[in-house]
Curated annotation (Swiss-Prot):
Catalytic activity: aldehydo-D-ribose 5-phosphate + D-glyceraldehyde 3-phosphate + L-glutamine = pyridoxal 5'-phosphate + L-glutamate + phosphate + 3 H2O + H(+); L-glutamine + H2O = L-glutamate + NH4(+)
Organism: Salinispora tropica (strain ATCC BAA-916 / DSM 44818 / JCM 13857 / NBRC 105044 / CNB-440)
Name of encoding gene: pdxT
Function: Catalyzes the hydrolysis of glutamine to glutamate and ammonia as part of the biosynthesis of pyridoxal 5'-phosphate. The resulting ammonia molecule is channeled to the active site of PdxS.
Protein name according to UniProt: Pyridoxal 5'-phosphate synthase subunit PdxT
GO cellular component: cytosol; glutaminase complex
Binding site for L-glutamine: G49, E50, S51, R110, I139, R140
Length: 201
């Protein structure tokens, strides 16, 4: 089986952790900081961090147009936490100068969990991932308040004060989660994305 080449946007966030998780899931993972590096990958991960900072750095490194074009051409992209915000068509509580890629028709609320219950761990059952629920970390995370037509809800918080909140979605080749799977030893979500990329090659 051919290993898909998956880039990790290496401007901020858990780049090393995502790279290691993708490699463990059978992908050829590499950092992406320049348009030329983006040209070499079959899929892209946008890691967590601070979404307004990522937005500025994407412009500074001249990656906005190339990423927009690759998304339009069908390249699979996975965004975690701030990466989810970068993929959303609408962001609540964001900054006015903040710009994402608007690939997924959804409304997300920035730092939604942060104001109420800060960082926490929770089980999330995800459609398409077999076995026990994923036990994942939320770090001042967003949640999804609305999804458009064609957006599949993959996971919600199972229990606690945020029970029922949407935290994982997919639209076509675009995947987004509120949480950080790279900070656990469970590689099933990265394997799911690697399979998505493999199918798109």
């Amino acid at each position: 089986m051919t290993a898909p080449v998956i880039g990790v946007l290496a401007l901020q966030g858990d780049v090393r952790e995502h790279t290691a998780a993708l490699a463990a899931a059978g992908a050829d993972a590499r950092p992406v900081r320049r348009p030329k590096e983006l040209e070499t990958v079959d899929g892209l991960v946008i890691p967590g961090g601070e979404s307004t900072t990522i937005s500025r750095l994407v412009d500074l490194f001249e990656l906005r147009e190339p990423i927009d074009k690759r998304i339009a051409d069908g390249m699979p992209v996975y965004g975690s936490c701030a990466g989810m915000i970068m993929l959303a068509s609408e962001v609540l509580d964001g900054r006015s100068d903040q710009r994402g890629f608007a690939g997924i028709e959804m409304t997300v609320r920035r730092n939604a969990f942060g104001r109420q219950i800060a960082s926490f761990e929770a089980p999330v059952s995800m459609a398409g991932i077999d076995g026990d629920p994923l036990h994942v970390l939320f770090i001042r995370a967003p949640w999804v308040e609305r999804v458009g037509r064609g957006v599949e809800v993959l996971g919600t918080v199972a229990e606690g004060p945020a029970a029922g909140r949407i935290v994982a979605v997919r639209q076509g080749n675009l995947l987004a989660t509120s949480f950080h799977p790279e900070l656990t030893d469970d590689r099933r979500l990265h394997a799911y994305f690697a399979d998505l990329v493999r199918a798109a090659i």
